[in-house]
Regions:
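Active-site beta3 strand of CheY-like receiver
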Residues: 47-53
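Short, flexible helix-to-coil linker/hinge segments that flank and couple to helix-turn-helix
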Residues: 89-96, 101-152, 156, 209-210
Length: 211
Protein backbone atom coordinates (compact mmCIF):
# COMPACT_ATOMS: atom_id res chain seq x y z
CA UNK A 1 0.00 0.00 0.00
CA UNK A 2 1.39 3.38 -1.06
CA UNK A 3 0.81 6.20 1.45
CA UNK A 4 -0.61 9.25 -0.35
CA UNK A 5 0.69 12.40 1.33
CA UNK A 6 -0.41 16.03 1.17
CA UNK A 7 2.44 18.39 2.11
CA UNK A 8 1.39 21.82 3.39
CA UNK A 9 4.06 24.49 3.88
CA UNK A 10 4.28 28.05 2.59
CA UNK A 11 7.99 27.73 1.75
CA UNK A 12 8.69 26.09 -1.62
CA UNK A 13 12.18 25.09 -0.53
CA UNK A 14 10.75 23.20 2.46
CA UNK A 15 8.21 21.36 0.29
CA UNK A 16 10.92 20.42 -2.18
CA UNK A 17 13.15 19.19 0.64
CA UNK A 18 10.37 17.03 2.06
CA UNK A 19 9.66 15.58 -1.38
CA UNK A 20 13.34 14.68 -1.78
CA UNK A 21 13.31 12.87 1.57
CA UNK A 22 10.14 10.93 0.78
CA UNK A 23 11.20 10.15 -2.79
CA UNK A 24 13.65 7.57 -1.46
CA UNK A 25 10.92 5.56 0.27
CA UNK A 26 9.10 2.79 -1.56
CA UNK A 27 5.81 3.10 0.34
CA UNK A 28 5.14 6.86 0.10
CA UNK A 29 4.24 9.37 -2.58
CA UNK A 30 3.65 13.13 -2.35
CA UNK A 31 0.27 13.31 -4.07
CA UNK A 32 -0.29 17.07 -3.63
CA UNK A 33 1.10 20.26 -2.13
CA UNK A 34 -0.46 23.30 -0.47
CA UNK A 35 1.08 26.69 0.33
CA UNK A 36 -1.57 27.99 2.73
CA UNK A 37 -4.40 26.81 4.94
CA UNK A 38 -7.19 27.39 2.44
CA UNK A 39 -5.36 25.30 -0.16
CA UNK A 40 -5.13 22.49 2.38
CA UNK A 41 -8.89 22.52 2.94
CA UNK A 42 -9.64 22.81 -0.79
CA UNK A 43 -7.46 19.81 -1.60
CA UNK A 44 -8.81 17.51 1.12
CA UNK A 45 -12.36 18.35 0.03
CA UNK A 46 -11.55 17.36 -3.56
CA UNK A 47 -9.27 14.37 -3.05
CA UNK A 48 -8.44 11.60 -0.60
CA UNK A 49 -5.09 11.45 1.17
CA UNK A 50 -3.64 9.02 3.68
CA UNK A 51 -1.58 11.56 5.67
CA UNK A 52 -1.31 15.35 5.82
CA UNK A 53 2.04 16.87 6.79
CA UNK A 54 1.03 20.31 8.02
CA UNK A 55 3.10 23.39 8.84
CA UNK A 56 1.23 25.07 11.68
CA UNK A 57 2.53 28.59 10.89
CA UNK A 58 1.42 29.39 7.34
CA UNK A 59 0.09 32.78 6.16
CA UNK A 60 -3.59 33.60 6.58
CA UNK A 61 -5.79 31.67 8.95
CA UNK A 62 -4.32 30.13 12.08
CA UNK A 63 -2.81 26.70 11.61
CA UNK A 64 -4.77 25.55 14.65
CA UNK A 65 -8.01 26.70 13.01
CA UNK A 66 -7.12 24.83 9.83
CA UNK A 67 -6.26 21.72 11.84
CA UNK A 68 -9.57 21.80 13.69
CA UNK A 69 -11.60 22.37 10.51
CA UNK A 70 -9.72 19.62 8.71
CA UNK A 71 -10.38 17.21 11.57
CA UNK A 72 -14.06 18.16 11.76
CA UNK A 73 -14.41 17.33 8.05
CA UNK A 74 -12.20 14.22 8.01
CA UNK A 75 -11.67 13.12 11.62
CA UNK A 76 -9.87 9.91 10.63
CA UNK A 77 -7.35 11.60 8.33
CA UNK A 78 -3.97 11.51 10.13
CA UNK A 79 -2.28 14.90 10.46
CA UNK A 80 1.40 15.19 11.30
CA UNK A 81 2.32 18.73 12.32
CA UNK A 82 5.77 19.83 11.18
CA UNK A 83 6.82 23.04 12.90
CA UNK A 84 9.77 25.33 13.55
CA UNK A 85 8.52 25.83 17.11
CA UNK A 86 10.15 23.77 19.90
CA UNK A 87 7.85 20.94 20.96
CA UNK A 88 7.84 22.01 24.59
CA UNK A 89 6.20 25.28 23.48
CA UNK A 90 3.63 24.05 20.97
CA UNK A 91 3.27 20.27 20.76
CA UNK A 92 0.72 19.79 23.54
CA UNK A 93 -1.46 22.54 22.07
CA UNK A 94 -1.62 21.00 18.59
CA UNK A 95 -2.14 17.49 19.97
CA UNK A 96 -5.09 18.77 21.99
CA UNK A 97 -6.39 20.39 18.80
CA UNK A 98 -6.47 17.00 17.07
CA UNK A 99 -3.03 16.46 15.53
CA UNK A 100 -1.81 12.86 15.37
CA UNK A 101 1.85 13.75 15.71
CA UNK A 102 4.29 16.60 16.13
CA UNK A 103 7.74 16.97 14.64
CA UNK A 104 10.11 19.95 14.59
CA UNK A 105 11.78 20.98 11.35
CA UNK A 106 15.14 20.27 12.99
CA UNK A 107 14.30 16.56 13.19
CA UNK A 108 16.29 14.00 11.21
CA UNK A 109 14.82 12.78 7.87
CA UNK A 110 14.38 9.28 9.29
CA UNK A 111 12.22 10.73 12.07
CA UNK A 112 9.87 12.19 9.45
CA UNK A 113 9.53 8.85 7.69
CA UNK A 114 8.95 7.04 10.98
CA UNK A 115 6.36 9.61 12.06
CA UNK A 116 4.41 9.37 8.79
CA UNK A 117 4.27 5.57 8.98
CA UNK A 118 3.19 5.70 12.61
CA UNK A 119 0.31 8.16 12.17
CA UNK A 120 -0.75 6.31 9.01
CA UNK A 121 -1.05 3.13 11.09
CA UNK A 122 -3.47 4.90 13.43
CA UNK A 123 -1.04 5.64 16.25
CA UNK A 124 0.20 8.91 17.71
CA UNK A 125 3.74 10.11 17.09
CA UNK A 126 5.54 12.06 19.80
CA UNK A 127 9.21 12.28 20.72
CA UNK A 128 10.66 10.61 23.79
CA UNK A 129 11.00 14.06 25.37
CA UNK A 130 7.30 14.79 24.96
CA UNK A 131 6.33 11.28 26.05
CA UNK A 132 8.18 11.82 29.33
CA UNK A 133 6.53 15.19 29.78
CA UNK A 134 3.10 13.63 29.34
CA UNK A 135 3.94 10.61 31.50
CA UNK A 136 4.98 12.77 34.43
CA UNK A 137 1.98 15.03 34.09
CA UNK A 138 3.97 18.20 33.57
CA UNK A 139 1.15 19.57 31.46
CA UNK A 140 -0.90 20.07 34.64
CA UNK A 141 -1.99 23.66 35.12
CA UNK A 142 0.14 24.23 38.19
CA UNK A 143 3.33 23.36 36.34
CA UNK A 144 2.49 24.94 32.99
CA UNK A 145 3.86 28.31 31.91
CA UNK A 146 1.25 31.11 31.67
CA UNK A 147 0.92 31.03 27.87
CA UNK A 148 -0.20 27.39 27.95
CA UNK A 149 -3.25 28.43 29.97
CA UNK A 150 -4.49 30.64 27.13
CA UNK A 151 -7.15 29.40 24.74
CA UNK A 152 -5.99 28.66 21.19
CA UNK A 153 -7.43 31.97 19.95
CA UNK A 154 -5.88 33.92 22.82
CA UNK A 155 -2.53 32.29 22.13
CA UNK A 156 -2.81 33.18 18.46
CA UNK A 157 -3.61 36.82 19.25
CA UNK A 158 -0.76 36.99 21.77
CA UNK A 159 1.76 35.75 19.19
CA UNK A 160 0.45 38.24 16.63
CA UNK A 161 0.75 41.13 19.11
CA UNK A 162 4.25 39.98 20.05
CA UNK A 163 5.19 39.91 16.36
CA UNK A 164 4.41 43.63 16.15
CA UNK A 165 1.04 43.47 14.43
CA UNK A 166 -1.55 46.12 15.23
CA UNK A 167 -5.02 45.32 16.54
CA UNK A 168 -6.45 46.31 13.13
CA UNK A 169 -4.03 43.99 11.28
CA UNK A 170 -4.87 41.08 13.58
CA UNK A 171 -8.60 41.74 13.21
CA UNK A 172 -8.32 41.72 9.40
CA UNK A 173 -6.19 38.56 9.41
CA UNK A 174 -8.62 36.65 11.64
CA UNK A 175 -11.79 38.16 10.13
CA UNK A 176 -12.83 39.51 13.52
CA UNK A 177 -13.74 43.00 14.72
CA UNK A 178 -11.21 45.38 16.26
CA UNK A 179 -13.35 45.37 19.40
CA UNK A 180 -13.13 41.57 19.66
CA UNK A 181 -9.35 41.61 19.30
CA UNK A 182 -9.11 44.35 21.94
CA UNK A 183 -11.18 42.16 24.26
CA UNK A 184 -8.85 39.22 23.63
CA UNK A 185 -5.85 41.47 24.33
CA UNK A 186 -7.28 42.60 27.67
CA UNK A 187 -8.06 38.99 28.62
CA UNK A 188 -4.55 37.86 27.65
CA UNK A 189 -2.88 40.59 29.71
CA UNK A 190 -5.03 39.65 32.70
CA UNK A 191 -4.29 35.92 32.43
CA UNK A 192 -0.58 36.54 31.89
CA UNK A 193 -0.37 39.06 34.72
CA UNK A 194 1.09 41.71 32.42
CA UNK A 195 0.39 45.38 31.82
CA UNK A 196 1.16 46.09 28.17
CA UNK A 197 2.25 44.81 24.75
CA UNK A 198 5.93 45.38 25.54
CA UNK A 199 5.79 42.90 28.43
CA UNK A 200 3.97 40.38 26.23
CA UNK A 201 6.58 40.75 23.50
CA UNK A 202 9.45 40.35 25.96
CA UNK A 203 7.84 37.20 27.39
CA UNK A 204 7.21 35.73 23.93
CA UNK A 205 10.79 36.30 22.82
CA UNK A 206 12.18 34.85 26.06
CA UNK A 207 10.04 31.73 25.59
CA UNK A 208 10.80 31.38 21.87
CA UNK A 209 7.15 31.84 20.89
CA UNK A 210 8.00 34.33 18.14
CA UNK A 211 11.04 34.85 15.94
Amino acid sequence: MIIKILIADDHTIVREGLKQILMDTSDMVVAAEAANGQEVLDKIWKDDFDVVVLDIAMPGRSGLDILKELKSFKPRLPVLVLSMYPEDQYALRVLRAGADGYLTKESAPNDLITAIRKVYSGKKYISNFLAEKLAFGLEADAARPPHELLSDREYQVMCSISSGKTVKEIADELSLSVKTISTYRARILEKMGMKNNAELTHYSIQNHLVD
